[in-house]
UniProtKB/Swiss-Prot annotation:
Protein name as annotated: Dihydroorotate dehydrogenase (quinone)
Catalytic activity: (S)-dihydroorotate + a quinone = orotate + a quinol
Sequence similarity: Belongs to the dihydroorotate dehydrogenase family. Type 2 subfamily.
Enzyme class: oxidoreductase
């Protein structure tokens, strides 16, 4: 019998979602700082058979934590102790910013979903960079072989105009690339005004080219570069982004971010309206995310690393994404509903799957 669903219902379901997130994340970090996390890691570490190589890096497991949970790099080590093969930090912007007004995070428990309009609240690239450097060094010390991987997701500062977006992304790339195992350009969040316009290939091409060059220069090595796209793109737009990624020699595409759609929800319509605008994540995104993955697989012919995220709840979902062409799979929303042993449970079940790769 699993205890966490009952604990969630009693302790967290009545609480403001953002406050519950803060408390839960603090508990995870406390387990690490007390030493309990290291003991826990002996039981949650992915089986060696799960090791996966993507863009020249070996990951302990194909399953990792998507951007959004640890926005500022405060708990990277602690989260890897729960079994995640990689942790994607962010979204981080060139300038520190408070994000949108609260409340800005809402649960739709009946749908196992979340609506957020956080707005990239973070300390800014300059403040986050030392945390990434420290976490990377610590993971290298603790894992002399294959270690958990640190991804860094960067976005546009809200106060920066769209025409100046490239220079803002370059600030982040310059500061963060040296401590990043891979870098993600986020142009698909619905919560920064105008950001999704950057998904237009004519705008996206020079942005990605500039970020890639700046990241490699700052790090003194090639930093794998990926772009994260929205599920709301048309098939034609998806094909265009795939072609652009191939033309530029990008290392991969992450699909998908949250959706602005509200189709197929079972939660009370009035409750959904009360949540207001924002990106929807969780189980309702499952079908569309898989659809986009398959489209990208066909469009790229397997030439790029595809990272699938959106509606991933269990090992079956992870396996389905791997079978559909993903090299890596990420989750986040189900972590809030399933509890701290979610990643370890998925890894155990994946390791039992004889045809995983």
């Amino acid at each position: 019998m699993r205890v966490y669903p009952t604990f969630f219902r009693l302790a967290f379901s009545w609480m403001d979602a953002e406050r519950a997130h803060r408390i839960g994340f603090r508990a995870i970090r406390l387990a690490h700082s007390s030493g309990a996390g290291r003991v826990l890691a002996k039981f949650t570490a992915p089986a060696p058979s799960l090791q996966t190589t993507a863009f020249g890096i070996t990951f302990p497991s194909p399953f990792g934590l998507a951007a959004g949970f640890d926005k500022e790099g405060h708990g990277i080590e602690a989260l890897t102790e729960l079994g995640f093969g990689h942790v994607e930090v962010g979204t981080i912007t060139g300038q520190a910013q408070p994000g949108n007004e609260k409340p800005r995070l809402f649960r739709l428990v009946e749908d196992k979903a979340v609506i957020n309009r956080m707005g990239f609240n973070n300390d800014g690239a300059t403040a986050v960079a030392p945390r990434l450097k420290s976490a990377r060094a610590a993971l290298q010390r603790r894992h002399p072989g294959v270690r958990p991987v640190i991804g860094v997701n960067i976005g546009k500062s809200k106060v920066v105009e769209l025409e100046d977006a490239a220079s803002d992304y370059l600030v982040s790339a310059r500061s963060l690339a040296p401590a990043a195992d891979y870098l993600v350009v986020n142009v698909s969040s619905p919560n920064t005004p105008g950001l999704r316009l950057l998904q237009n290939v004519e705008t996206l091409r020079p942005l990605l080219k500039a970020v890639g060059e700046e990241a490699d220069k700052a790090a003194g090595r090639h930093v794998p570069l990926l772009v994260k796209i929205a599920p709301d793109l048309t098939d034609e737009d998806i094909d265009d982004v795939a072609k652009l990624a191939l033309d530029l020699g990008l290392d991969g595409i992450i699909a998908t971010n949250t959706t602005i759609g509200r189709e197929g929800l079972t939660s009370d319509p009035e409750k959904i309206r009360d949540c207001g605008p924002g990106g929807l994540s969780g189980a309702p995104l499952k079908a569309r995310s898989l659809e986009v993955l398959r489209r990208l697989k066909e469009a790229t012919g397997g030439s790029l690393t595809l990272v699938s995220v959106g509606g991933v709840e269990n090992a079956r979902d992870v396996q389905e994404r791997l079978d559909a062409g993903a090299t890596l799979v990420q989750g986040y929303t189900a972590f809030l509903y399933e509890g701290p042993f979610w990643a370890a449970r998925i890894n155990r079940q994946l390791a039992k799957h004889p045809a995983r790769r």
